[in-house]
Amino acid sequence: MCVFFATFAENFNYSMALTRTYYRVAEHLFAVDSSYSELLQCMTNYEPFAVEELLGERRKAKGERREDEEIFTLRVEKAIGERLKAKGEGWTHVLTDNAEEDMPRIEVYKARRREGDEAKGEKGWLFRVAMVANAPLCCEMEWSEDFTPGVLHIMADCQDVRFCIDNALMLLYAFRTAPLMTLEMHAAVVVKADRCAVRCQTAALLDRPNGLIDQQELGYLFLGHSGTGKSTHARMWLEAFDDAWLLNDDNPILRVMEDGEVRVYGSPWSGKTPCYNNAYARVGGLVKLSQAPHNKIRTISLPEAYAYMLSSASGLKMDRQMADSMYETIKHVITHVKCYHLDCLPNTEAAEVAQRGMV
């Protein structure tokens, strides 16, 4: 983990030249620009998703549009003072999210539109982030209205650069991909041998040759609020079944493909468990977990499934267009994937009950 006990300004050497790196997550391409050569040391969790050969190809293309155009670019800079120089100066405060004291505080501002102003550059969003509720700001994120280009301003006295990078990319990715039938989920995902083939894009991570898994496998998403036991239940599957493996422990990506297939992908974001698998599986089931003195699984109704999925999906739900996009994606998922509720204990019997109930 890249946590600095000196400041950002003391640890990072500035260069006039921008370095661009490309990453592909759930088959969506994005880019990160920075003038700080040490930045990549903080981004080891992104290495399995790096697309190293792309930069040279882009240079040869000389500006020609490619089918795999990046969906957004994030530029990382050191902040020179706060972007919000005075409260309300050009920005309208629309939300502060700090539900728990030990969780990050996120302040959301929307740029005010001047009368007759239709220029994209004059509209957008400003997110101000602190590591915990009462801490000073560690970074500010300034994005266009459609979340295509973005700038991450890291405060000079920031002690945890990776925290800033991860949060900026997680938020930008979630917001930008919402219209693309993609959802960034708060869930743990286990893949188990079943009826569907899985392609692993980074074979070394799973120690399997040629990037292929010669089994029929499905991915199962375990949903629930923080503290429910998603990671614990996923671990029970690994203990109960020899052919099960962990795809992601906290922030998988759910995507509806052009042919309607629903897939779950690994991501560079995985909470406390370092699980950065660049792989995917067809979704076999979504399971809402509840702690209970017994193990029991049941199929749930579409309204229940919608509510559980919406609460587990990352997105700026106050934005009408984004909310509509999320609705369409969730509607497709819950009508094409079986959804369940599992009352469970933290034991392997819970995994066995869940697995039998989803057959």
Task: Give the ranges of each region predicted by the language model.
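Compositionally biased low-complexity segments enriched in histidine and/or tyrosine
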Residues: C2-V3, R83
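Conserved glycine(s) of the Walker
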Residues: G229
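Hydrophobic positions on the alpha1 helix immediately C-terminal to the Walker A/P-loop
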Residues: H233
